[in-house]
């Protein structure tokens, strides 16, 4: 969740994002960066810079390497550079410079993927990174890109050159033609892979529908309806076995859908009437909760299979528990920016 150019909450938070398995989340601040354990909530690392904002932080699971990009009012690093930070040495150990601003960075143990506004560059994760691939995209100001973290699957997904299309490339065999998915008619706003890299979920800027595709064939598996009114989708995430997804939007709600068993999702009683528009046969979330503050948030599943975590731009942390029938209760509420590492 990129909060640049300004965060209305005035708490210095510029960016928040989960690591690959959602076990941690990292925050870019106007004066450094922080790393937290997601569930249970615990501050793991706090690196403060005297002068310098960090607009993007990308973790690599729980290892000591993080990718940093400068941001905020006084960026710590130029926004056209990717800095690889070694948290054991407490310093940057790799630096990659570009001619334009960096929109996002993705890491896996052998690759650094850098997203620019109309292309994606792939490098070796070595002391002197070597450029391996360049992929063209449509204009991509949000830096949409997902990299499968599974060691047996080198799948990279990003917006194609055509509006609403998703391109899937296997970095282990780039000679194979990419899978091109015409996911939406409008501009993409969010994409997410499951941990195994077998499913991809997509949303457009309209934000009413979430679509799930098979990554090997590109076939549509499910179409899910978040709502009837347009919304800005901030985040989509699968759970560990890809049976569920959670979705957050600017309506202040987090929706939970069944990704594998469509019967669990709610459907209109008029769904079987063939003369009615497709809207009435839509599959709706079986559970949802309202973030009390209504603040922009990212969401992911917690350590318990029936838990969803919301990390909000105003510094609030919520953990909700949901039942198989969809009832939802708030379990934890905290202010993560006000924590110190010995509070929890």
Swiss-Prot record:
The keyword ATP-binding does not apply. SMART domains: WD40 (SM00320). A motif (L/FRRG motif) lies at residues 224-227. SUPFAM superfamilies: WD40 repeat-like. GO terms for biological process: autophagosome assembly; cellular response to starvation. Pfam families: PROPPIN. It is found in: Preautophagosomal structure; Lysosome. Keywords: Autophagy, Lipid-binding, Lysosome, Repeat, WD repeat. WD repeats lie at residues 183-223, 228-267. Its main location: other. GO terms for cellular component: lysosome; phagophore assembly site. Transmembrane segments: none annotated. GO terms for molecular function: phosphatidylinositol-3,5-bisphosphate binding; phosphatidylinositol-3-phosphate binding; TSC1-TSC2 complex binding. The keyword Cell inner membrane does not apply. Disulfide bonds: none annotated. The L/FRRG motif is required for recruitment to PtdIns3P. Component of the autophagy machinery that controls the major intracellular degradation process by which cytoplasmic materials are packaged into autophagosomes and delivered to lysosomes for degradation. Binds phosphatidylinositol 3-phosphate (PtdIns3P), and other phosphoinositides including PtdIns(3,5)P2, forming on membranes of the endoplasmic reticulum upon activation of the upstream ULK1 and PI3 kinases and is recruited at phagophore assembly sites where it regulates the elongation of nascent phagophores downstream of WIPI2. Interacts with the TSC1-TSC2 complex; stimulated upon starvation. Interacts with RB1CC1. Interacts with ATG2A. Belongs to the WD repeat PROPPIN family. This is WD repeat domain phosphoinositide-interacting protein 3. It comes from Mus musculus.
């Amino acid at each position: 969740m990129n909060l640049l150019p300004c965060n209305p909450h005035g708490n210095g938070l510029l960016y928040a994002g989960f690591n690959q398995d959602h076990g941690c989340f990292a925050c870019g601040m106007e004066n450094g960066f922080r790393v937290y354990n997601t569930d249970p909530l615990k501050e793991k690392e706090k690196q403060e810079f005297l002068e310098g904002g960090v607009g993007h932080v990308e973790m690599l699971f729980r290892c000591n390497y993080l990718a940093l990009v400068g941001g905020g009012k006084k960026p710590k690093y130029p926004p056209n550079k990717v800095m690889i930070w070694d948290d054991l040495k407490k310093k940057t150990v790799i630096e990659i410079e570009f001619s334009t601003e960096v929109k996002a960075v993705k890491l896996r143990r052998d690759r650094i993927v850098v997203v620019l506004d109309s292309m994606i560059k792939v490098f070796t994760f070595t002391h002197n990174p070597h450029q391996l691939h360049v992929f063209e995209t449509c204009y991509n100001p949000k830096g949409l890109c997902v990299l499968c973290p599974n060691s047996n699957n080198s799948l990279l997904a990003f917006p194609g050159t055509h509006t609403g299309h998703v391109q899937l490339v296997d970095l282990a065999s780039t000679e194979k033609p990419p899978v091109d998915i015409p996911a939406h008619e409008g501009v993409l706003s969010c994409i997410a892979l499951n941990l195994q890299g077998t499913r991809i979920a997509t949303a457009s800027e309209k934000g009413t529908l979430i679509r799930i595709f098979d990554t090997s064939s590109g076939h549509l598996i499910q179409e899910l309806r978040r709502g009837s009114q347009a919304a800005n989708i901030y985040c989509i995430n699968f759970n560990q076995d890809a049976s569920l997804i959670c979705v957050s939007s600017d309506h202040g709600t987090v929706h939970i859908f069944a990704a594998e068993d469509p019967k669990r999702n709610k459907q209109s009683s008029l769904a079987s009437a063939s003369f009615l528009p497709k809207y009435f046969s839509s599959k709706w979330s079986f559970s949802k909760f309202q973030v009390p503050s209504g603040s922009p948030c990212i969401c992911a599943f917690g350590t318990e299979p029936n838990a969803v975590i919301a990390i909000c731009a105003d510094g609030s942390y919520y953990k909700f528990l949901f039942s198989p029938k969809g009832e939802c209760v708030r379990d934890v509420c905290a202010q993560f920016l006000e924590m110190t590492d010995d509070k929890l």
